[in-house]
Amino acid sequence: MASGSVQSSSGNGRRQAAVVDEFTVPGDKRSLLEKSRPRIQALFPVLFTVLGSLETFQQSEVKEDEEKPGRIWLQLKGEKQAVRRAKEYVKGICEPELEEKQSYPKEMHCIFAGAQSSFLNHLIQDTCADVALSDIGVLGIKGATEPVVMAQSRVQQFIALFKDNLSLPSHKEPAVKKKFKLYVEKHVDKYTVDLLLLPSALKSELLSLACDNQLSCEDLSRQSSDDKAECKVNQKDEVSRKGAGTPVTELTSQLDSVFSSAAEDSPCLIECPYSEQDRLSVKRRSSEAEERFSKKPFSLEAVQVDGPVNRNADKNNVPIIDLISEPSDFEDSVIVVEADDCVSSETEYKILVNFFKTMGYSQIVVEKVIDDLGQSEEPLKLLEEIEKQSKKELSVPFSQSSSYSTDLLKARGTSSLPKCKIAIAETVQSAAPSKVQPKALLATDKAGPSNPFCYKSQTKATVVNPIPTDQTTIVAPAERAFNNHFDPPLTGVQIFQNSLKVQYRLELKNEPGRWDLKHIIIDGSNVAMSHGLQRFFSCRGIALAVEYFWKKGHRNITVFVPQWRTKRDPFITEQHFLQQLQELGILSFTPSRTVLGARIASHDDRFLLHLAERTGGIIITNDNFREFVVESPSWREIIKERLLQYTFAGDIFMLPDDPLGRYGPKLDDFLSKQPNNRTVHSSFPSSNERFVPRDQFAPPRNMAPKTGLNQPMAPRAGHNQPMAPRAGHNQPMAPRTGLSQHRFLQLIKPQEPFTPALHNIARPCPIMPPERSPSETMQLKEALLKIFPEADQRHKINEILTAHPFMRDLNALSAMVLD
């Protein structure tokens, strides 16, 4: 090993010692080192040279025992600290003492792959270990023992900060976010948005890692100072700024003075840190939805970059990030517009609408005002008009109801006010008269319900116009005057997000279940979307469904969810329930993958039907599976008989007591492998049904028999006469078949009530209906064959029609075929 030093002068005028260090590594690493030379020189400010193998020197110097054969000489030249760290890194990749695999959440992939891999490079510079991405979610770390342990500890620290989702103190957080944002935008790539959504504590740690390199910190500070200088130049050059600005950028400057006290609640617009010339042609809008909803993940699939993103010295070629996200109330987290002539009116319109929406105004009102006044109108005028329209919309119900009640009073011919509390959406102009006594107000409280025109609301009334003194007046205290400020209307999304604040833990007791229960197969996507109001994929809904069946004794429970639902997405809530259920072996992910930005996913409903066919289980879903009815007879039978629908009442999972209808089996029998035959009823009358609905018994009108009140109707000859019900009871006993009670009562004439005075009088019995004609039988057969087209069902249909010559009810015949 050889080393030496020469004097070199640095850029700041001080002379620093340039160290030359030579050492050997195994000769088989020569090709690896040749390929890695540019990367090593980029990571460490050194000059790296591969000198050659020892055999070359042995031939000239004839010293065979100086070094072992098969090794090569390397030379590093640079500052002492840089040479030492580069040497440790090179020896680590050539002769590693330790190799480790460190896993991390896939949502953190942006840290190691994003910002043009700058954070990964700084981690290597800081620890001198070779850190590389083995796969998404896995890091490969190798090198000397101490560097590997340091790198692994640093990565684990990042993971802990990410999982804890910690925030910095309020006085430090804005500065860290701004500094991190400048750094990330300097190294822009397709992971930029995901990096901006990281917790602020993790951002601070990444900045400290990056700023260990003095050059990075100097660049950031220089860029920040350039920003300030550009701001001053732009303030002086107001004419040029207005020429290149848009109504959205003008809106920011005008609203700074109006909403200075609510800077955190209103979104702001930030200009990109470029040169003055670029600043006039490039505008950037950053929605603070990413800060207000920092806990919500962002889907990596929503970011697409047109072409590769490289570090460009030419500032004219500014990379543009297009964000394609699902429609939501907080769209377009980042929008970069290149050049003023490229801004379309549609983009301008969308930016304006989204800006006012984030301030809490209704989208309908915002679009109406912009359409009326035009999107080129002064932003403050747009804001004032939007506020006026919002107030009008909220005041319309009050004015309409007030005029309606006044018209009703005039129609009744009374001049007195109704003695109830009336809320009037106007401000009190004068103080309450001193003649009104408190007792008068108490008296009207009781008189309210007697008046049909009183409002149900107990809001205090306010009187605007003077009222004659001879009438009873109701005046609210002056301090309870109606407030002109209107809060934005409550939405279902807000209710759902508030419900998530209530903590819920999935706890399944470790106790034996019931062996006689069927396998439960849950359509995870259907359940999650149902609990999330069809807007959010609520993993809590899946957990609630699993907990419900677990408490009922089911232990064979399977939930199917597509694999892509594991990605971070603001519309997927409480994803930790998916991980918990997967660890318990209850959750199964259906395959999905992404190829060139396009998602390829298998149909998860097919997995539900396949498993139900193999296990005889019940599918929990609100889907009808119409597209699978014709797939196979077994699937059709599953769809008809083994789908269990559900509903959510908040966080309460509810199932119907009669899953197959009013006359079907009860829920417990439906879920049991061996249901109780005494309690199971078919949805239709059974095959041995002897009672037919009344309209099937009735003969033609011209053949109706004329009998007296107490005269029994003559039975048709040649047929057994049904036994008459016994008199002396208030109502007949219901038959044991699935026929409902009201059908059975139709067999008795409604004109003949059961009274104690008629105990011994025989009741009239219905006559038997005539047999079907051949044409009727043929029509029924054709109808049944349309319902059951299978060849094996034709013989059964013929047998049923032959065995029941009086039956004309298509539903009853269909039930017999199913039985």
UniProtKB/Swiss-Prot annotation:
Residues 80-164 form the KH-like domain. GO terms for molecular function: mRNA binding; RNA nuclease activity; ubiquitin binding. It comes from the Eukaryota. InterPro entries: KH_N4BP1_1st, KH_N4BP1_2nd, RNase_Zc3h12_NYN, UBA_N4BP1, UBA_N4BP1_C, ZC3H12/N4BP1_RNase_Reg. Its EC number is 3.1.-.-. Keywords: Cytoplasm, Hydrolase, Immunity, Innate immunity, Nuclease, Nucleus, RNA-binding. Residues 1-13, 673-689 have a biased composition (Polar residues). GO terms for cellular component: cytosol; nucleolus; PML body. The keyword Signal does not apply. GO terms for biological process: innate immune response; negative regulation of cytokine production; negative regulation of proteasomal ubiquitin-dependent protein catabolic process; negative regulation of protein ubiquitination; negative regulation of viral genome replication; regulation of innate immune response. Residues 772-819 are annotated as: CoCUN. Residues 517-669 form the RNase NYN domain. Disulfide bonds: none annotated. Residues 1-20, 226-247, 666-736 are annotated as: Disordered. This is NEDD4-binding protein 1.
